[in-house]
Amino acid sequence: MVTGERAVTAAGGFNPSWQRHVAAYELCARFLGPGPVLDLGCGVGHSFERLAPRETVGVDIAAEALRGQARRTIVADMRAVPVGDASFDSVVCMHAVEHVPDPERVVAEARRVLRPGGVAVFVTPNRLTFGLPDEILDPYHFVELDPEQLRGLVAASFDGVEVLGLFGSERMNAFLAPEKRLMGRVLRLDPLALRRRLPRRVLQRLYDTTLTLARRRADPLAAAIGTHDFSLAADRVAEAIDLVAVGRVA
């Protein structure tokens, strides 16, 4: 069962999640220098090809995600990476800061390993698009951020910050719409919000089941979506699917 929390396949209804992750690397490569890149929470290794010919080093806490990657990888918590200070020109952290309760430690670690003039790019889902005002719906997420919260998080460790939005095409938004409606129906079945009392592991199973059922439907839109269905923009960031923060070191 796969939800897109860790994009491991482009098969079937999971193709849009795969393309969304790949597009983040491709679109954000423009901010990076030519030197070595540290990829925090790298998963199965999109950066190896998408950021080439730069040297990339992948960091992930899950050893199985790193297995078979033809590059240097490090099994480690991205909040405490066993590499020296000022050892990379760039850092990327794609869809990862939301998976720890203290994302400020991830941002501080990215700053620590960067050389003067370095750049870090953080991509995370937009809370205003996928969440509720008072609740994180994705049980795999410890935090979800709006544009100003992300700006503040990165500004605490970096000398300059730019926040942009990663937007989906009309086709991508049309694919997401039924999932949002399904989630709304599920929430209406629990008007007393009893779900908030359930253990996180139970919520994760329920979430997996709901999205897996949604993505198994025969939807030609899923197969048609590619990286060309995503774009970066500095306007109307609050409406974006994902948020992109570019932190710069003086």
Report each predicted region and the residues it spans:
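Short N-terminal helix/helix-N-cap motif within the alpha/beta-hydrolase-1
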Residues: 101-105, 132
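Conserved N-terminal segment of class I S-adenosyl-L-methionine
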Residues: 1-84, 90-94, 107, 165-167, ...
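A short His-aromatic
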Residues: 95-99
